[in-house]
Amino acid sequence: MTGEKEKVPAKHGWIHDNPYLLLALAALFWSGNHIVGRAIGGEVPPIGISTVRWLLPTIALGLFAFPHIKSDWPVIRTHWGILLWLGIVGGALFTAGQYIGLQYTTALNVSVLNSLVPVLIIATGGIIFHDRVTPVQLCGILISSIGVLVIIAQGQLSNLQHLRFNWGDIIIVSNMMVFAVYAVYLRKRPPMHWMSFIFVFGAVSALTTLPFMLWEMAAGITFKPTWLTVFAVVYVCIFPSVLAFAAWNRGVQLIGANRSGPFVHLVPLYTAIFGSVLLNEHLSTFHIFGFALIIAGV
């Protein structure tokens, strides 16, 4: 017994009970967040966007999901400790670290460091919960990691020698470790409606980062009101926040953190596709080969 998966409730619907689709969608929404985060660098403060990213969805969920929150309130009161922990780690720390890191490092480096997530999840689960890893899982991680490196190296191994890392990369690596901790602790999430969980998760995250956002504002670091920043706020409030975390949480609930980890490798795949479609970046043969390896490993 690894304790990796929590007990799964009765079926609710095809999408809700399809972990692979849910995890692929979570990676899709997070890849869009990377593009938006890079596009608005310098336009919005990192802590400010982290706070708004959870504050606005929490307010909206508080209005639309009130019956679920009311019904789940006894569970929330009983399990407030783990809910507080998940909100601080997975919401406040991970989100803020992501935007801070994007201020100082390149998309290429982020793609390299993202490939650490599946390994970090396995290592963290082994250390904290003594999880066991199957040979198939290790093989899948290895194959998808090679696919990521093929894309990053543009098909030439020598290109990896020219990668340069900075202290922003240290932030990203630390952030990947934070996400791994969040992923393995999801098994402790109490049984409650997904809207109730996201409401509490978002409220904890927003309240944790709010004082730092106020400090940013006092220091004169504020949002620059443009159509780009408005679009960015709308996007990050809906897709990489509510929808991505709801999909990821459910996927981990269904198949466990270790098997979910390799889906993070889809993020650079999606990012490359978005770059080709939206930014007219050229798709090469090495992209296709790398994509095939990523899909095979996942």
Residue ranges and their predicted role:
Residues 61, 84, 124, 133-155, ...:
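Hydrophobic transmembrane alpha-helices of multi-pass small-molecule transport proteins
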Residues 2-51, 88, 161-188, 208:
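Glycine-/small-residue-enriched transmembrane alpha-helix faces in small-molecule transporters
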Residues 2, 42-93, 120-121, 177-182, ...:
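Transmembrane alpha-helices of multi-pass small-molecule transport proteins
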Residues 36-39, 43, 57-76, 146-162, ...:
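Membrane-interface helix-cap regions at the ends of transmembrane helices
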Residues 35, 61, 121-123, 127, ...:
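Transmembrane alpha-helical segments that form core, pore/gating elements
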Residues 29, 33-34, 62-114, 150, ...:
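Specific transmembrane alpha-helical segments of multi-pass solute transporters/efflux pumps
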Residues 40, 49, 53, 101, ...:
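Hydrophobic/aromatic residues within transmembrane alpha-helices
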Residues 50-52, 91, 95, 109-116, ...:
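Helix-helix packing/entry segments at the starts of transmembrane helices
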